[in-house]
Regions:
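Juxtacatalytic substrate-recognition/specificity segment
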Residues: 51-183
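Compositionally biased alpha-helical segments
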Residues: 1-94, 120, 214, 220
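Acidic/His/Gly-enriched intrinsically disordered linker/tail segments
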Residues: 49-50, 122, 128-143, 153-156, ...
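Conserved beta-strand and immediately adjacent loop positions that scaffold enzyme active sites
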Residues: 9, 106, 190
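Sparse recognition of residues in long alpha-helices and their boundaries
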Residues: 16, 96-99, 207
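Flexible, glycine-rich phosphate/dinucleotide-binding loops
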Residues: 19, 116, 200
Length: 259
């Protein structure tokens, strides 16, 4: 399926959801409709190499490939499954048209940092991400912050899972087009707006538009720590023009989107 044409190249969507480049001359057009890979086939294709011994769970829209604890897997599944319908409904109520995903949504969960980094080298501070090209959310149960503050680490992890899950949902229901260029503060601020979570024994998604406790706390700390009355304006200016956001930038982007 052609995602976009770029000069003499096409960006093609494969049945497993990945986007890959192809020369226009190497592609033959067909009238057959695009059909995503069946879940069983995709799960089998994913469970090779470092993922060969991982467990598999499937739902209507998701395939979970994991070797984490069952408790962590359950918490992530509850959040992602509840968000899928909730975010979809919220976006439709805003007046946007949505469509059902045409490929299974893949979520890969690693127990250890070493396995996570071996699968894909990434900044050690990143504990979960949505990969725009392969369409997968990848996360790790073990976080560096846990050695310092387990409660805060849990809150950060659950919040990040929801955030990356929102990115995956929006890019698969037609609300955002993969590889499209949006201002960073809008893309990340809207994801934070849709992804607030609770922590403790009842880890769950709070609902789109509810106060994002993690980001509210960060804004409060930052504002109280500053004496300069102009600093808030500077913080906003820096965030809306940034190509890459700091943690404070994420909090500011959420605040701008929420209020």
């Amino acid at each position: 399926k052609v995602h976009v044409a770029v000069g003499e190249y096409l960006i093609v969507k494969l049945p497993d959801g990945q986007l890959v480049p192809r020369k226009s001359d190497d592609v033959n057009a067909t009238e057959r409709p695009f059909v995503g890979m069946p879940m069983d086939d995709l799960a089998r294709e994913l469970r090779v190499g470092p993922l060969a011994e991982f467990k598999v769970k499937k739902s209507k829209h998701y395939i979970y490939i994991y070797n984490t604890s069952e408790a962590f897997n359950r918490a992530a599944v509850v959040i992602l499954e509840s968000m899928f319908n909730g975010v979809n409904t919220y976006v439709r109520n805003m007046g946007a048209k949505t469509t059902a995903p045409d490929v299974p949504l893949v979520v890969i969960m690693f127990k250890s940092r070493s396995e996570y980094q071996e699968y894909f080298r990434i900044d050690p501070s990143i504990i979960a991400y949505y990969h725009i090209l392969n369409n997968r959310v990848v996360m790790c149960e073990e976080t560096p912050l846990a050695r310092v503050d387990q409660a805060l680490a849990d809150q950060q992890l659950i919040s990040t899972i929801a955030h990356e899950g929102v990115h995956q949902i929006l890019h698969n229901i037609g609300a955002q087009s993969r590889m499209s260029a949006w201002p960073m503060w809008i893309t990340e601020g809207f994801a934070e707006y849709l992804a607030p979570t609770t922590v403790g024994n009842n880890r769950r998604w709070k609902g789109a538009g509810q106060v994002n406790d993690m980001r509210m706390m960060e804004l409060e700390v930052q504002i109280k720590a500053r004496d300069n009355a102009n600093w808030t304006g500077d913080m906003i200016s820096e965030s809306v023009t940034a190509r890459q956001l700091t943690s404070v930038g994420y909090a500011t982007s959420w605040g701008l989107t929420h209020y």
